[in-house]
Structures are given as C-alpha cells and as structure tokens.
C-alpha cells in the first residue's frame, strides 16, 4: 500500500524568524475537497482546517533557525526544514511529494517535486496549512513581545508598515541578518 506524504514550507520570504515545513500523511477518511493552498484560505478557515488535519493525519513540523537561514541561505534552510519534518513523521511514507522544484537531500525516501503542488495535491495543501498556522502563531506571539512591528498581522513579511517600523525602531534579534533591507541596516 502506498503511503504518501505531502510536504510544504512557509516563511521563505519573511524578514523575521525561522522557516517552517510540515509533512502530512492524510488518513483516507479526510475530505480532501476542503484542502487548498494555505495562502488562498482565510485565517479563520485555516485554523479550523488545521485542527481537522491534525486529527485526520500523521503530521510533523520541521524548522530551520535564524542562524541556519543566515549560514545556509533561505533555500537550503527551507530544504533542511523539509528534511526534518519528513524524518519526524511517526510512519515512514513510501512516497514524498514536495511543493516546488527542489528536493531536500534525504536518503532512503522516494521524493518527487511538484511545482504548485500546494494547489494540486491534497497532502501538500494540508502540509501548507499545518506549516502556515504553526509559523503564524509563533511570529504572532513574538509580535506581542516586540511591539510596533505589527507581526500579528504581517507575520514578519516586508510590508510597508513593517519596513517603516524597522526604520524607526531598528532591527531585532529575530530579523534575518542576511535579508535585504536588514543587511543594509546592521
């Protein structure tokens, strides 16, 4: 029997915090018609689906830290987060479908990259939702400690409000030091 895991990452373009990835093996009982790319679903619906997916799947989260992002670059850090998520699954999948066009370096797994997989493959869509809700909560909680950057709404992405806050308040220890415009402000 084929056991398929879907994998996606979130946070690559953010100026703040770790990059997260999720790996999800869906149970047959889940209604896959509800699953779409996390970016195309409202925040409230994502949270409902997050709970539903967690109850109806085997799932795991992987992340790469700020230090790893700055040392490896964002692409390699994203692939590392994916590898960690796959390895943390409680059941080894026979096939792993990954959103995008790059694959992590991981032995003894059958991997396949799928461009726009988060829009085509339910298990990748589910991984997208798990990763996004998880990361959004972490960054939102950080925003409560680092007021003024509006991370509860922009989740660390380079919105005009966030960039203005950086100019006024400066960078924090949670900003990615190798990312523009952060690297110009050090």
Language model segments and positions:
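RNase H-like, Mg2+-dependent phosphodiesterase core
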Residues: 1-186
């Amino acid at each position: 029997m084929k056991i398929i895991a879907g994998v996606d990452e979130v946070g690559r373009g953010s100026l703040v915090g770790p990059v997260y990835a999720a790996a999800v093996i869906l149970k047959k009982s889940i209604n896959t018609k509800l699953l779409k790319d996390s970016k195309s679903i409202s925040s409230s619906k994502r949270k409902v689906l997050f709970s539903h997916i967690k109850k109806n799947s085997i799932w795991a989260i992987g992340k790469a830290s700020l230090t790893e992002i700055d040392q490896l670059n964002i692409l390699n850090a994203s692939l590392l987060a994916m590898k960690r998520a796959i390895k943390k699954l409680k059941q080894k999948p026979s096939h792993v479908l990954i959103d995008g066009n790059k694959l992590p370096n991981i032995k003894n797994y059958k991997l396949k990259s799928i461009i726009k997989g988060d829009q085509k493959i339910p298990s990748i869509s589910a991984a997208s939702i798990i990763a996004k809700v998880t990361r959004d909560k972490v960054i939102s909680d950080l925003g409560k400690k680092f007021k003024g950057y509006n991370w509860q709404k922009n989740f660390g992405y380079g919105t005009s409000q966030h960039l203005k806050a950086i100019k006024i308040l400066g960078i924090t220890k949670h900003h990615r030091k190798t990312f523009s415009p952060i690297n110009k402000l050090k």
